[in-house]
Amino acid sequence: MSWLEKIFNTSNIVSSRKASIPEGVWTKCTSCEQVLYSAELERNLEVCPKCDHHMRMKARKRLETFLDAEGRVEIGAELEPKDVLKFKDSKRYKDRISAAQKSSDETDALVVMKGTLLELPVVACAFEFSFMGGSMGSVVGARFVKAVDAAIENNCPLVCFSASGGARMQEALMSLMQMAKTSAALARLSRKGLPFFSVLTDPTMGGVSASLAMLGDINIGEPKALIGFAGRRVIEQTVREDLPEGFQRSEFLLEHGAIDMIVDRREMRQRIGGLMAKMTNQESPLVVPVDGSH
């Protein structure tokens, strides 16, 4: 073997390992496409620090960051979905439920908790969009009614964060009945004089937007949230007209009086806490006075 062959002999070369980066360390913003450090994004409540784009947030994480840390109690966790109709499309509904539970780490698309917000008692619930598109089935309806019952029992406000594609197709008429069921429950809450704060996040569509999501005493949108009943293309085909740009975004809805305000997720605790204190005539040392100009 010549001296040159000895130098380039592969057995003498020690390969340097590529530094392995664990999965999930970095995230790309879906709006500005900046690469973000996941831990920083989580600290910022899933709001892009570069462009303020509000990304979708897990229901449980949303409630844990919204409510005070002490005294949170989950409600309705014992209720689980059942395939009463033995429904099957391209896949059995039973299999869809199992897959959704595994991927989302939730048993259904609504998580309910009671606790306090800035030391004021409250019941809060949030839709889990990763569970079958946050669709509303029998369990979602039943858990929402339990949330209303808990608010009445504790004489406190109810807050709901909606993120849903609408009624759950696989439960047919039973899912449509949840629109009436949740609306009737909110009527009971209203008769008791207890406020309901509805926070519409991206996306809030279909049967959820046509029922509980739009029945708030105060309807709050997150910035640039998609809110509506049917999709843009379906509406354009029906009315045979071109629709204005962004007509289903929260900014357009605020401009036309369909919602009451738009609140940045990072300010949600203070804004809702301040409104709760005013509407229930309570005081909390943690509430910053709400500016009436907004």
Swiss-Prot record:
Its EC number is 2.1.3.15. The gene is accD. NCBIfam families: accD. InterPro entries: AcCoA_carboxyl_beta, Acetyl_CoA_COase_Trfase_b_su, ClpP/crotonase-like_dom_sf, COA_CT_N, Znf-ACC. Zn(2+) binds at residues 29, 32, 48, 51. This is Acetyl-coenzyme A carboxylase carboxyl transferase subunit beta. Its cofactor is Zn(2+). A zinc finger (C4-type) spans 29-51. It is found in: Cytoplasm. Its main location: cytoplasm. It comes from Aliivibrio fischeri (strain MJ11) (Vibrio fischeri). SUPFAM superfamilies: ClpP/crotonase. Keywords: ATP-binding, Cytoplasm, Fatty acid biosynthesis, Fatty acid metabolism, Lipid biosynthesis, Lipid metabolism, Metal-binding, Nucleotide-binding, Transferase, Zinc, Zinc-finger. One of its GO terms (molecular function) is ATP binding. It catalyses: N(6)-carboxybiotinyl-L-lysyl-[protein] + acetyl-CoA = N(6)-biotinyl-L-lysyl-[protein] + malonyl-CoA. HAMAP family: AcetylCoA_CT_beta (MF_01395). It is an enzyme of class 2 (transferase). Binds 1 zinc ion per subunit. The lineage of its organism: Bacteria, Pseudomonadati, Pseudomonadota, Gammaproteobacteria, Vibrionales.
